[in-house]
């Protein structure tokens, strides 16, 4: 597929997701990075978003709960270019009923070439980057060219 570019603004749109066993870890990371996160637009799956907002006071746009379709809602926002960064603390040692949704969310993040952090270390590296505070060009699939070729 042909590629095009998309500009991520200096104030990123960041999705926050965590499996049940990882919610405490994500809360700790968010609390430690609250000052940085306040400069961005935050989204989350339902249960995670409500918990983070309640505990930190951050403004977070919450989807519905992940197992009820929240992962899919975030995936749709990614494919529409409305999410720039995905922070997803998932539990690799515990299967969840909505594993196909989890895989789909990670796949769509890769398709649309957005940065993904899956644990505290990768989130720390990602948020330590000066690119988090800058306008950034990323390559994405050129879906419009794809549609034009199909007709």
UniProtKB/Swiss-Prot annotation:
Organism: Vibrio cholerae serotype O1 (strain ATCC 39315 / El Tor Inaba N16961)
Catalytic activity: dihydroxyacetone phosphate = methylglyoxal + phosphate
The protein's name in its UniProt record: Methylglyoxal synthase
Recorded name of the encoding gene: mgsA
Lineage: Bacteria, Pseudomonadati, Pseudomonadota, Gammaproteobacteria, Vibrionales
Binding-site residues for substrate, renumbered to this chain: 19, 23, 45-48, 65-66, 98
Function: Catalyzes the formation of methylglyoxal from dihydroxyacetone phosphate.
Keywords recorded for this protein, A-Z: Lyase
Alphabetical list of SMART domains matching this protein: MGS
Active-site residues per Swiss-Prot or TrEMBL entry: 71
Class of enzymatic activity (EC top level): lyase
